[in-house]
Regions:
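N-terminal auxiliary segments of SAM/dcSAM-dependent transferases
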Residues: 30, 52, 93-165
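Short, flexible coil/linker elements and helix-boundary hinge sites characteristic
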Residues: 4, 79-81, 109, 211
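Short domain-boundary/entry signatures in modular proteins, especially
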Residues: 10-18, 71-80, 111
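Generic hydrophobic, helix-prone segments enriched in Leu/Val/Ile
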Residues: 1-3, 69, 89-93, 102, ...
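Charged, low-complexity, helix/coiled-coil-prone segments
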Residues: 65-84, 135-148, 192, 243-257
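Conserved AdoMet
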Residues: 50-107
Length: 302
């Protein structure tokens, strides 16, 4: 952590705000239905957005616990379009509702440490130059109310390239407590994102059986099984993986989640059990370094 950084306390907004629950483009309807399940006393409106679900509400926190979105972002409303040059973009972003969003939502008035992320087709070297110039100019314009700290930050500014040129700007607040996936202390390279696992389970919910006996033959760090049990409680849960490090991580994750799951470090094809399972739920291994023939053989055996 950078020395002297003062953490800010999120206290909520005094006025209703727009915020985006970014999610899988093809499954936005699932998240929309979960938004509609939040008390109408909090919600003002909600609608589909190209990146997810756009919500207008007086308190963001009841929505933060929804499991099927990837990120919670606030649209930064600029007075002028955000241009493609770094200095002009910084000026446009500062001439917006950004300062109001930050000061209204936090108790402390100390500087906010930020990181800039640019989603564009710009070459990496030009993107780095843009980020450096943008960040320095935003620091200057804000009188160092905003301080560039890419390795230890509380807020993230996201610039998304628009089809018609320029950028759309979003704000991500790391000051909002997100306990949804706090159990996931361990992951490996092939691990599924927990929000993706939650989305898959939400889509499968009509077919899930309460108190079922479930098997994940390629369980990794246990994310699919944990999310399955959170959505619809199961009776017996078994996770198998040939990768010992993943199984160790899965046991820890399940413990953090308060889940009782039987994890076995073994090749699925060598596994036998005394009774049949009601469900198999898994994130199947991808091809990776295997040849197409090896992958076809693997899936054929499965």
């Amino acid at each position: 952590a950078a020395e002297g950084i003062t953490r800010h306390t999120f206290v909520g907004f005094t006025e209703p705000q727009d915020f985006l629950l970014a999610t899988n483009r093809e499954q936005r309807g699932v998240t929309l239905e979960e938004v509609k399940a939040v008390s109408a006393s909090v919600r003002r409106s909600e609608k589909l957005h190209p990146l997810g679900v756009l919500v207008h509400a007086k308190d963001v926190r009841p929505f933060a616990s929804i499991r099927t979105y990837r990120e919670l972002l606030f649209p930064v409303r600029t007075a002028q379009p955000v241009p493609e040059d770094a200095l002009g973009a910084a000026e446009a972003v500062w001439d917006s509702n950004l300062r109001e969003l930050l000061t209204q939502a936090h108790r402390e008035t100390t500087p906010f440490y930020f990181r800039l992320e640019i989603k564009s087709h710009m070459p990496l070297d030009k993107k780095s130059t843009f980020a450096r110039r943008f960040s320095a100019e935003l620091e200057r314009l804000s009188g160092r109310m905003l301080v560039n700290a890419p390795s230890d930050y509380e807020i993230e500014l996201r610039l998304l390239e628009k089809r018609d040129g320029g950028y759309a700007c979003f704000l991500k607040l790391l000051t909002i407590a997100h306990g949804r996936f706090a159990y996931r202390k361990n992951a490996v390279a092939a691990s599924i994102h927990p929000a993706t696992a939650a989305m898959i389970v939400a889509l499968a919910e009509p077919y899930l059986k309460e108190n079922a006996q479930i098997l994940d033959p390629f369980c990794g760090v246990g994310t699919m099984l944990i999310e399955r049990d959170i959505r619809v409680p199961a009776r017996e849960k078994y996770g198998i993986d040939i990768f010992g490090e993943a199984i160790r991580g899965a046991r820890e994750n399940a413990s953090y989640a308060g889940e009782k799951i039987n994890f076995i470090n073994r090749d699925y094809f060598d596994f036998t059990h005394a009774y049949l399972f009601d469900e198999i739920i898994t994130n199947m291994p991808v091809r990776g370094r295997k040849s197409k023939e090896e992958t076809d053989t693997f899936y054929g055996r499965f």
